[in-house]
Amino acid sequence: MRLILLLLILTITPQPPGDPYYVAPAGVTQFQQAAGIGLLAHNTTPEGRAFAALKPGDIVTVTTKGKFQVVAVERWYICTNLYCNAQGERLTEAELSVRIYGGEYPLVLQTCIEHGGDYSWGRLFI
């Protein structure tokens, strides 16, 4: 059995128009190109660490949007000019973006994965 009590009141900053790579240095950033709700946070912040702690079955509440259950967690790392996962899949940045943000999931939380001191070694999608 697992019980997680986590309450964070997060301020969400929109990305500047035309800058889909912008992530606010603190807090959460709303990803402008997501078909649903895409929220980004650096893994060095409390928000990013909270994203990384989520597991399938956990519930995330977004005020005015509702409750969402975590159904999948995907980990991707950068290999050459592609993104790779543990299952051996290899995708371009555009392919990964469509897969994650193309509309299958109404809410996506994203942070980076640190590995060996490289804080942007990979990407974590919840």
Model-derived segments and spans:
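Solvent-exposed, non-transmembrane regions of membrane-associated and secreted proteins
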Residues: 1-126
